[in-house]
A protein has these predicted regions:
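Extended alpha-solenoid helical-repeat scaffolds
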Residues: 1-173
Length: 173
């Protein structure tokens, strides 16, 4: 079972990435569905620092590390057709947040999961449309869409979801 454990270890920069990779391997599969949000939150926190900003972990600016974090979040939650996800509105929010903070090329995976979830989970469609409308109306996201690692591919998913399910929330379109 995943147990939230905070350790403070003093290490040099050479060992930090190795230790972090070992910790990530333990998060590969939380033992209970209830532990998934905690694990995803923990991974998301590490991915949230902006490009080039040194963080307490020292690794958020390393592209390979950020890619590993993003892929781990996507893998944990999508495993066995989303059996680890009990709240799809929460996971849709996680996917959109990840599109904003990843700064690595995971846009295709996020796009595919957004479309897949909305197609499978009728109860999440209204929320998805609202979320996608916000994304499409975000000028900053749109202006940065040409940047490497911008996850601009999610804009396709947002447009498709809004078009396909526009009747779910016509007031926001």
């Amino acid at each position: 079972m995943f147990i939230g454990l905070r350790l403070r270890i003093q290490v040099d920069e050479d060992n930090l990435q190795s230790i972090t990779q070992q910790l990530l391997s333990h998060l590969a599969g939380p033992d209970s569905v209830a532990a998934v949000p905690t694990a995803v939150h923990s991974l998301s926190q590490h991915a949230q620092s902006p490009h080039g900003v040194q963080t307490s972990s020292g690794l958020a600016g390393i592209r390979a590390y950020r890619l590993t974090l993003a892929q781990r979040i996507l893998s944990i939650c999508s495993r066995d057709t989303y059996t680890n996800v009990t709240d799809f509105e929460w996971y849709l929010s996680v996917l959109v947040d990840l599109a904003y903070v990843a700064s690595v090329n995971v846009g295709l995976q996020i796009r595919d999961q957004l479309v897949d979830i909305v197609g499978r989970v009728k109860a999440a469609r209204r929320y998805a449309v609202k979320l996608m409308v916000k994304l499409l109306n975000d000028d900053t996201f749109l202006l940065n869409a040409s940047d490497e690692g911008s996850c601009a591919e999610v804009l396709w998913a947002a447009a498709w979801i809004c078009g396909e399910y526009c009747g779910w929330d016509p007031s926001s379109l």
